[in-house]
């Protein structure tokens, strides 16, 4: 994920090409990332990510959902995250609250997916205690 916003080109070898990785790749590509994936090797060219024209389908990947929400928010993007029925039943409060405190506007289905996150105004640092989430 970080390679998608880093300067230059990154190559990662010996990746397990599972469904979670594919969900991440598809979401990043929808935001303009330049990613080539073949034979357990992925090449990512860092770019300025852009607002996607579609909802970002995280499949069943909670990791994709949680990490990409922070990454894209840091890029001042406006996006919607969706997932399969299993992921859509998992509470997202532990990412909603910190992102809201950082300045994102978020709408959700009672703290469940889909999440629409508007971070166009940017995010600020916060002091957060994870015990309360």
Where are these regions (language model features)?
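Structural preference for solvent-exposed beta-strand-turn elements
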Residues: 1-131
């Amino acid at each position: 994920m970080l390679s998608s916003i880093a300067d230059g080109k990154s190559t990662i070898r010996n990746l397990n090409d599972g469904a979670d990785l594919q969900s991440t790749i598809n979401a990043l590509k929808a935001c303009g990332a330049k990613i080539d994936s073949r034979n357990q090797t992925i090449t990512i060219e860092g770019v300025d990510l852009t607002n996607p024209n579609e909802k970002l389908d995280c499949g069943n990947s909670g990791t994709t959902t949680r990490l990409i929400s922070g990454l894209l928010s840091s890029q001042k993007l406006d996006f919607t995250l969706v997932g399969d029925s299993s992921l859509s039943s998992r509470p997202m409060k532990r990412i909603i609250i910190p992102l809201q405190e950082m300045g994102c506007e978020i709408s959700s289905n009672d703290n469940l997916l889909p999440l629409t996150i508007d971070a166009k105004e940017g995010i600020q640092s916060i002091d957060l205690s994870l015990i309360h989430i």
